[in-house]
Amino acid sequence: MRPLMMPLLVGALGLAVPVVPAPAHAYVALMAGQSARPLQGRFNNVPVLHSNQPEEVQGEGILVSTTPGYAYAAETGQPLANATYTFNGEFGLHVHHKYHPQDRSRISLPGGRRGELTLATILINPGPNPVHLRFSEGAVRNSFEAPYLATNLMGVKPLGPRPWNTGPGDATAVQMLRQQLDRRLADEITIPPYSRLVLFSTALPAKGIANALLKGRSDGPFQMAVVAAEDPTSDLDILAVLDSGRLAPGRIYLSRVNQIQSGAVFSRVAGVALGDRYEARVDHDLDQSPLHVPLTSTNRHDFGTGEIQVNPLAARMLDSSLDNVGTYGVRFKVELLLKGSGPYALVLSHPAPNGRHFIAFRGSIGIK
């Protein structure tokens, strides 16, 4: 028996992990003539605020808020109910946005500078008692701190510091896989009664990308909001965006709400998902057959297993996806108890049905 533990932090659809006899010359097509096996794992119930809709933010405004009430869409003036939720205890945060300014002049300002958008997460204490938060792991990166290097996207990541090479999403995921907290983030913070604090902010030049993943625990109830501010000079300017009651422009799925409800389109996540961890255990004899297990399977792509590995939302904005499609910010911990005479190859693949083209999985896995 060869135990193999594979923690992954993933955000891609339709990943599959086959364990197959090592080929003498070349790999055959993934799963050719073979079937996949469901993992039959489970998500935990840790609430995670996801701010990913709109992915491409066009200007200043609120992105998502869990306070009671509503905010007005920049495109239509329509009031949209907030993703109302109060956190208390263990929690998580996932933020992923691009800045594509509606005002195209901000792409290139005088002096060769680009206009900047500040993404910020705000903590809100609605009650009469102070709330203390402790953070155990996480990071915030933008694409200028962690750029994509197209010629060096994959590779082994040593345990020590290294230049990130696969973008801000991978940079933050690696920090989570290592269970480390970015030294630039506070490991604890107290929100006074009836108060609001800016937890962190990152300035994002036009056409840039930012990603944040964070895990923590509170000793009392609190709420969160994520906002975008153009050229703020202080935290007061950031809080003023929340007080404006105006959503950031770029919500392209507002006109497709019926298609979201019917399942015709996924949209992106703006709300609170239940689950930051998925655990499964598989026993298999490789002398009997290869093993194929899907990761992040959906109702559209389950590889014949009938298993949907997507966690639900406890609260969502109207134009959000119906669940945490893509399982962003979820750590998949899969324990493979394998036996066989070997040698065998462990392959992480991103199969595309019917030869269609998709963005390849470029995330990180940890193997123990």
Model segments located where?
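Short aromatic-acidic-glycine turn motif
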Residues: 140-156, 223-225, 354-367
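Solvent-exposed, conformationally flexible loop/turn segments
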Residues: 88, 184-197, 207, 288, ...
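N-terminal, Lys/Arg-enriched amphipathic/low-complexity engagement segments
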Residues: 30-92, 96-98
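C-terminal segment of classical bacterial N-terminal signal peptides
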Residues: 14-23
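Acidic, serine/threonine- and glycine-rich low-complexity intrinsically disordered segments
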Residues: 192-321, 325
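Asparagine-centered strand-capping/turn motif at beta-strand->loop junctions
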Residues: 97-101, 109-117, 122-131, 137, ...
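Bacterial N-terminal signal peptides that target proteins for export
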Residues: 1-8
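Intrinsically disordered, low-complexity Pro/Gly/Ser/Thr-rich segments with frequent PxxP/GP/PP motifs
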Residues: 150-205, 368
